[in-house]
């Protein structure tokens, strides 16, 4: 009987395939998986890729999968002994195995509320969206579904569409405002397959942003709602909590490849607005790389080298001096000493 139930679950139609990359997520992954399984009014599967975890994540996943056939552990060839390959490779493995009409991103340390999937599917049907996203609610301790979202909440719900130039502009590094790259969209699986969309394996931070750029460049209709149903956990466990130089370099190389070839290159050739937005985004990455090099130099005691790097790029200098002044203000009343940030603020997740 148990085998028949499992076989039925493997062949039954699926509305949404949740793609979950997990690395050392043992404290949170059960909450994340159960939140996906508890979606109301939709048939789901949860495809979980354990990416070289060493903290018991695999044991938690095995226990949950044994109890519910909708949970599908997806193998991933390791880069080495317990060496994680990164979220992009893990997402690609899950994406290749997905059976749902839609695919949805759910990080292993996040969660979603029970009516999220049904609500977003209804909105997608009403707006003919290929990508649909809601308003993430950041949290650090206990999740409050009524908490403040990243986007403004109004008395009346609202929707807006996201164009390619707008998406590039709002996701520039080191600029104020909401980064739409933090959104965790659901995507029509047939659109993804039709255009051969995949994650860039080398990118560990900003992978969802790049995936959405590729989708928009292929003509996807991207709709965002003020409805808030995704709980986004902030904290050191999040890959996007900090950006290191290597992260930015990989993101820059991947974006450059997009900009110089494929669908995005065609948009840049035809649209001055997209050319400008693309250049501005890459310029922000260049500034972020300089800042990361300054931080590395300062951490190694090479202060003069760091100062020279910053002075050579005025935007980097302004950002760093502003950060130091803000840090000094927080230490008012105490002895001040120079302090460098140990990493950059997070960019698109």
Question: What is each stretch, according to the model?
Answer:
Residues 2-246, 335-336:
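Nucleotide-sugar donor-binding/catalytic module of glycosyltransferases
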Residues 2-3, 210, 217, 222-349:
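C-terminal subregions of glycosyltransferases and related glycan-biosynthesis enzymes
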């Amino acid at each position: 009987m148990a085998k028949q139930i499992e076989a039925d679950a493997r062949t039954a139609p699926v509305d949404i395939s949740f793609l979950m990359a997990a690395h050392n997520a043992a404290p949170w992954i059960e909450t994340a998986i159960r939140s996906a399984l508890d979606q109301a009014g939709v048939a789901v599967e949860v495809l979980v890729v354990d990416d070289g975890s060493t903290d018991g994540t695999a044991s938690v996943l095995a226990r949950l999968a044994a109890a519910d056939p909708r949970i599908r552990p997806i193998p991933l060839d390791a880069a080495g002994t317990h060496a994680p390959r990164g979220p992009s490779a893990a997402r690609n493995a899950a994406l290749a195995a997905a059976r749902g009409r839609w695919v949805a991103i759910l990080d292993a340390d996040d969660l979603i509320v029970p009516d999220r999937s049904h609500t977003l599917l209804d909105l997608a049907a009403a707006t003919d969206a290929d990508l649909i996203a809601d308003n993430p609610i950041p949290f650090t301790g206990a999740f409050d579904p009524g908490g403040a979202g990243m986007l403004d909440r109004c008395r009346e719900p609202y929707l807006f569409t996201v164009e390619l130039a707008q998406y590039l502009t709002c996701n520039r590094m080191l600029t104020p405002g909401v980064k739409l790259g933090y959104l965790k969209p659901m995507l029509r699986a047939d659109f993804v397959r039709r255009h051969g969309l995949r994650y860039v394996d080398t990118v560990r931070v900003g992978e969802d942003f790049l995936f959405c750029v590729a989708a928009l460049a292929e003509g996807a209709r991207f709709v965002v709602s003020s409805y808030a149903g995704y709980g986004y956990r902030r904290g050191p466990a999040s890959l996007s909590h900090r950006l290191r130089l290597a992260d930015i370099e990989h993101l820059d190389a991947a974006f450059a490849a997009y900009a110089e070839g494929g669908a995005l290159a065609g948009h840049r050739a035809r649209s001055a607005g997209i050319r400008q937005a693309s250049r501005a985004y890459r310029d922000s990455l260049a500034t972020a790389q300089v800042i990361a090099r300054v931080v590395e130099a300062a951490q190694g005691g090479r202060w003069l080298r760091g100062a020279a790097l910053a002075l050579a790029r005025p935007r980097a200098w302004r950002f760093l001096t502003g950060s130091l002044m803000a840090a000094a203000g927080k230490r008012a009343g105490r002895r001040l000493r120079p302090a460098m940030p140990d990493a950059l603020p997070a960019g698109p997740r």
